[in-house]
Design a protein with these regions (language model features):
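N-terminal catalytic or cofactor-binding beta/alpha core of small enzyme domains
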Residues: 2-155, 160-265
Length: 265
C-alpha cells in the first residue's frame, strides 16, 4: 500500500468526534490496572453509524454492554488506573491482532456491517492508525511508566458477554479467561466459585489465543505480568445497580487476592 493511498482518504475522526479513550483514576495507587477494550459504541460521524441502525449498535455486537460502568465503579473502589475505549468494536476490535479476520468484521452475529464490506487496504490501515494503534500505545505508555517506577501491576481485561448466542442460553454468570499464564486466573476462578451463588466458566464462554486476542498475549504474557481476562454476563450489569453490585463484589475479591497475587508478580 502506498502512503499516497492512505493520505488520499478523508479523515476518519473529526473535531466533533469523541476522544479515543477515557482514563479513570489516572493517579490510582492500586497495583490493579483495568482495560475495557469494548467499553464504547461510538462511530465516527464520517462513517454514519457504519450503515447500521442504532438498534444494532446497541446490541452486544456493538459493544460489551455494561462493562464501561462496571469498570469505572471498580476503578473507583480500588483506586485503580483504568482505560475505557470509546469506539464500537464493529469499527475496529481493539482486542484483536491485526491479522485477525474479525479485526474489522463484515458480519457479526448474522448482521452485515455495510461500512466494513470491501474495505481497501488503505481504509483498513486508516482504522488501525486512528483507533487500534494509539489506544494500545496509551496502555503501553502506562505499563512502561509503572515498570520504570518499580510498581507491580496486576492486569485485568474487563469484558461482558451476551446471555444467548446462536440460540443457546449461556449458564455462566461470569467467566475467567486465560491462555498460558494461569496465576491470576486460577486464583480468581476459585474465589468467584467460593462466593457460592455463581456459576463461573473456566475459559468459558470464550478461550484466549494469540491469534484471536490481543490484550492477553501482548500486554499480559508479552510483559510477563500477572493478568486475567474477566467476562460478566450482560444481563447482570445492564443497569447501574448491577454494575455497582458487581464492582463491589469484585473490589472485595480483588482486595482479598492482592497479597497472594503480588507474591506471584
Amino acid at each position: 500500500m502506498a502512503d499516497a493511498d492512505l493520505h488520499a482518504l478523508p479523515a476518519l475522526l473529526g473535531a466533533d468526534d469523541p476522544a479515543l479513550y477515557t482514563i479513570h483514576q489516572p493517579q490510582g495507587a492500586s497495583p490493579f490496572l483495568l482495560l475495557a477494550d469494548h467499553a464504547g459504541q461510538q462511530v465516527p460521524r464520517a462513517l454514519a453509524g457504519l450503515g447500521l441502525p442504532q438498534a444494532e449498535l446497541d446490541r452486544h455486537i456493538g459493544w460489551d454492554i455494561g462493562i464501561a460502568g462496571t469498570t469505572r465503579a471498580l476503578a473507583e473502589r480500588l483506586d485503580a488506573w483504568a482505560i475505557e475505549q470509546t469506539y464500537s468494536r464493529l469499527l475496529i476490535d481493539c482486542n484483536r491482532p491485526l491479522a485477525s479476520p474479525t479485526l474489522i468484521p463484515e458480519v457479526s452475529d448474522h448482521t452485515v456491517v455495510p461500512a466494513n464490506v470491501g474495505l481497501s487496504t488503505a481504509q483498513r490501515q486508516q482504522r488501525i492508525d486512528a483507533i487500534h494503534a494509539p489506544y494500545h500505545a496509551r496502555i503501553d505508555a502506562e505499563l512502561d511508566a509503572r515498570r520504570d517506577a518499580g510498581r507491580a501491576t496486576l492486569l485485568v481485561m474487563m469484558h461482558s458477554f451476551t446471555p444467548v448466542m446462536n440460540g443457546m442460553q449461556r449458564p455462566w454468570q461470569a467467566g475467567v479467561l486465560y491462555h498460558q499464564d494461569t496465576r491470576f486466573a486460577h486464583a480468581l476462578l476459585q474465589a468467584l466459585r467460593d462466593e457460592g451463588d455463581l456459576v463461573v466458566g473456566d475459559n468459558e464462554p470464550y478461550s484466549v489465543s494469540s491469534t484471536s486476542d490481543y490484550a492477553v498475549p501482548v500486554h499480559g504474557e508479552g510483559r510477563g505480568l500477572v493478568h486475567v481476562e474477566l467476562e460478566i454476563r450482560q444481563d447482570l450489569i445492564a443497569d447501574a445497580a448491577g454494575q455497582q453490585a458487581w464492582a463491589e463484589r469484585l473490589a472485595r475479591i480483588f482486595s482479598a487476592l492482592q497479597p497472594q497475587l503480588l507474591a506471584l508478580a
